[in-house]
Amino acid sequence: MTRSYQIRTYGCQMNVHDSERLAGMLEDAGYVRAGTDVDPDVVVFNTCAVRENADNRLYGNLGHLRPAKDRNPGMQIAVGGCLAQKDRGEIVKRAPWVDVVFGTHNLGSLPTLLERARHNEEAEVEILESLDVFPSTLPARRESAYSGWVSVSVGCNNTCTFCIVPALRGKEKDRRPGEILSEVQALVSEGVLEVTLLGQNVNAYGVEFGDRFAFGKLLRSCGEIEGLERVRFTSPHPRDFTDDVIAAMAETPNVCHQLHMPLQSGSDRVLKQMRRSYRSQRYLDILRKVREAMPDAAITTDIIVGFPGETEEDFEATMQVVREARFASAFTFQYSKRPGTPAAEMEGQLPKEVVQQRYDRLIELQNQISWDVGKELVGRSVELLVAEGEGRKDTETHRLSGRARDGRLVHFTPVGAVDGQVRPGDVVHTTITRAAPHHLVADSEITAHRRTRAGDHWEEGVRPKTSGVSLGLPSFGAPPAQPAAQQGCAC
């Protein structure tokens, strides 16, 4: 009898993409995706360990599943991802109804571990300390018909004092340029219009094979792939953000003028305590160069409020950088103490009420800036890649949603001849009529509508399914010279 599965994903884009790999492996092993109205035979939690409430969220959700497990002993529950890598066997101690625990380094073991647990009728816990196989070797069931994630590396060599990710995902491992471009080409061949290049520190790409200009070259090579309309990347580190990457962004037509670059703090003293290896002026200088090369660039960031020892003066320095940077938007976080990180042991842990008050002030400032920046775009014509389910009120307002080339979310009204014809994955042109802090609105006429293969696939329920690229871990040393190829690999 065919068994069904459901994957619940928490955390960053890396986890979202890892879940696509998990789905691809399960389907290759004969599982089918569970419908929304049935209990799955296998539930997989792909977890995050970055925020303090990650533990509570996981164990709360596991508790909610226990009655279903009691009713159906054949149901299996698996826990993977960063929290599994951290907590290991503690998970089955706290939730003994869990069947499988696997980490960030052995995604490919999941089908085997499920079968072993079912056969042995006991929990299987397998956590590796380094990569078993590179994730790109695993098949993937893609979630989107029009947009795809492509990892350029896994792991991180930075030692930020607040971050537990390097301890859980390991040192940086880079894929070879040809492997990356082959995966991008495979996605485009399936109708995908947009790819996002992923890495914990994406612009450090090339460190493993000694080419500090490798990421800029990779962007330019993506520009040679016919049919690839949009290229994005996340997340870069200011320390490694070089002028050649700015030039590649500005000079490669399909690379989007969008930059998400974490600031974390505007205080040089706090940045030093965070081990961020840049200072606020260096950060602002990068933004200046980006805007000189691409005046239309949308720049977003991450900011942590309430890092241990942060003074009112430190916080005001962050507010000043935010005023100068004029971010299109910012992901703001209250500092979360994570056991196992140096920051967790630092003196000067701030009272919750102080952190909350500063957080509220930062949110108020950034919302106003986002709104002001958005209002400058009213009257501008934009090209939108129509997206699925990004507008919470789309059903009520009869609007659809899409992403502009700079990544901004735009809600638009498909009236007239295109009413009922526009699908996720299609491309439309319209004009911005109104701005809000977190989105733009285009209630004007649709001036152009292009139906795409991606839209056809969305309508048919077809999603790309890519096989693994290459075998084993990437080799060390410089990559071999790439022959002239259709995808224009010049790395």
UniProtKB/Swiss-Prot annotation:
Q: Which residues form the TRAM domain?
A: 375-446
Keywords tagged on the record: 4Fe-4S, Cytoplasm, Iron, Iron-sulfur, Metal-binding, S-adenosyl-L-methionine, Transferase, tRNA processing
Q: Where in this chain does the record put each Radical SAM core domain?
A: 142-372
Q: What detail does the entry give on cofactor binding?
A: Binds 2 [4Fe-4S] clusters. One cluster is coordinated with 3 cysteines and an exchangeable S-adenosyl-L-methionine.
Q: Which cellular component terms (GO) are annotated to the entry?
A: cytosol
Q: Which InterPro entries match?
A: Elp3/MiaA/NifB-like_rSAM, Methylthiotransferase, Methylthiotransferase_CS, Methylthiotransferase_N, Methylthiotransferase_N_sf, MiaB_methiolase, rSAM, rSAM_horseshoe
Ranges of residues in domain MTTase N-terminal = 3-119
User: What residues does [4Fe-4S] cluster 2 bind to?
Assistant: C156, C160, C163
Q: Required cofactors, per record?
A: [4Fe-4S] cluster
Pfam families in alphabetical order: Radical_SAM (PF04055), UPF0004 (PF00919)
Hydrolase keyword on record: no
What does the record give as the reaction this protein catalyses?
Answer: N(6)-dimethylallyladenosine(37) in tRNA + (sulfur carrier)-SH + AH2 + 2 S-adenosyl-L-methionine = 2-methylsulfanyl-N(6)-dimethylallyladenosine(37) in tRNA + (sulfur carrier)-H + 5'-deoxyadenosine + L-methionine + A + S-adenosyl-L-homocysteine + 2 H(+)
Check the record and name the SUPFAM superfamilies matching this protein.
Radical SAM enzymes
Q: Where in the cell is it found?
A: Cytoplasm
EC class of the enzyme, as a word: transferase
Which Enzyme Commission number(s) are on file for it?
A: 2.8.4.3
Q: Which family does it belong to?
A: Belongs to the methylthiotransferase family. MiaB subfamily.
The record's subunit annotation is:
Monomer.
Name of the protein this chain belongs to: tRNA-2-methylthio-N(6)-dimethylallyladenosine synthase
Its source organism is Saccharopolyspora erythraea (strain ATCC 11635 / DSM 40517 / JCM 4748 / NBRC 13426 / NCIMB 8594 / NRRL 2338)
Taxonomy-wise, where does this protein's organism fall, top ranks first?
A: Bacteria, Bacillati, Actinomycetota, Actinomycetes, Pseudonocardiales
